[in-house]
Amino acid sequence: MAAIPASGSLVATHDYYRRRIGSTSSSSSCGSSEYSGEVIPHHPGLPKQDSGHWWSSFFFGKQNLPGMGTVAEEAQQKSGVVSVTNGQVTCVAREMVMRQASESSDGGKSEAGNS
């Protein structure tokens, strides 16, 4: 049975993964601190975005499915909220808008009834 030298392949493997994770050295061939570690090539079928989240364009892309966002739009119109970031409303924001709308329609009675 062959023995694996402790200072041989394990150190080389450690160095390999350390370089892939992104540690930079002064002898880097690119010469820029902007590119550290392995550069992942951009797929030509995916649009380039500043956020770096390719999956966000996949899920929340340009396609407009029928019936999408109508609940959020109605909630915004009722509560008077106008600003929407990138046309997206998260579940948390939607809950907050609905809660504010219900509290304003109650006139604060729910808070007074609890005390």
UniProtKB/Swiss-Prot annotation:
Residues 22-37 have a biased composition (Low complexity). One of its GO terms (biological process) is cell differentiation. Keywords: Developmental protein, Differentiation. Residues 21-48 are annotated as: Disordered. Probable regulator of exocrine pancreas development. Belongs to the PPDPF family. This is Pancreatic progenitor cell differentiation and proliferation factor B. It comes from Danio rerio. The gene is ppdpfb.
